[in-house]
Amino acid sequence: MRYWNRWCSAVTLLGFAAPLAAQGSGGAAMPATPVTSDMLLNAQQSGDWLMYGGNYWNNRHSPLNTINTTNVKNLVPRWVFQTGSEQNASLETTPVVVNGIIYFTSAVAPNNLVFAYDLKTGKPVWQKELKVASNAFGVACCGRNNRGVAVANGMVYVATLDAHLVALDQATGDVKWDVVVGDPAQGYTETMAPLALDGNVIIGTSGAE
């Protein structure tokens, strides 16, 4: 997917409607629901998608069964959102879903973008643009990309290409804190999705990635 998207002028995030689900217009998403440590520990039992790998085992399995091998062929788009992309960038984000709100990222130059959208309607709850230092572009090993966020304790955590770890308010997208975890001048960048665990945020960094 990474290489294919380098040739695309735009990438899209699709919301699909299952034919067996209610087809009404649907109400707006509930107010931002803080994700607790207990919710994350039991994520494999949730109908939401609370973290990058689905749960701490990273098995990317959902217990939901409304969409199955019988009716998947009948899915139709409910809404489409263009995140924007370009040559030398790609869409590699894994969306996180919490109580009707979908959180995802994009790495369109020159900055990192974080989005919170109503899962049913495709309408924005908030969008945040995080400025990225230009010296990160030349050292990123595989083009500009971002793999997603961690949501926990009322915060949305995201890493930026220039090796910052940023905490955003889950309800508003406002920056709560911003820390440096690496230096692009020394070849360090960040593209990974952070991991929230027991009140902490875990992130790694390595040369040129």
Predicted regions and their residues:
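Mature extracytoplasmic enzyme cores
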Residues: L113, H164-K176
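Short alpha-helical segments and helix-capping/turn motifs at coil-helix boundaries
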Residues: T33-S37, N99, G187-T189
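Aromatic (tryptophan-biased) beta-strands that constitute blades/sheets of beta-rich domains
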Residues: G24-S85, K123-G138, D174-D183
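N-terminal signal peptide c-region/cleavage motif recognized by signal peptidases
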Residues: A17-P19
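Repeat-blade elements of multi-bladed beta-propeller folds
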Residues: L50-G53, N88-L113, G138-H164, T189-E209
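Bacterial N-terminal signal peptides that target proteins for export
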Residues: M1-V11
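N-terminal export/assembly segments and adjacent metallocofactor-ligating motifs
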Residues: L75, N112-F115, T121-G122, N200
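Structural recognition of the beta-propeller blade-terminating site
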Residues: N68-N71, D118, D169
